[in-house]
């Protein structure tokens, strides 16, 4: 099963010490580079920064469809846009995102 995540699910679950639930439910979680950068930005420390850098079940991937990302950023931030693009590229079974 391929699962792609945006920043918020990782950040929010890490903040309440329940990030392990993603691993229990899905095994491996894939995040795009923009999500990795958002979570690990030293200027804006957030919950989950250590985990995305150390947990081997959270894997960072590069997106290829930059045209789609550019189109999506007119309505979404970069992390969300890359998460959607990555979900499409990998034919993910689920995307974890807090947008409607």
Give the role of each language-model region.
Residues 1-94, 100:
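Active-site-proximal, substrate-binding regions of enzyme catalytic domains
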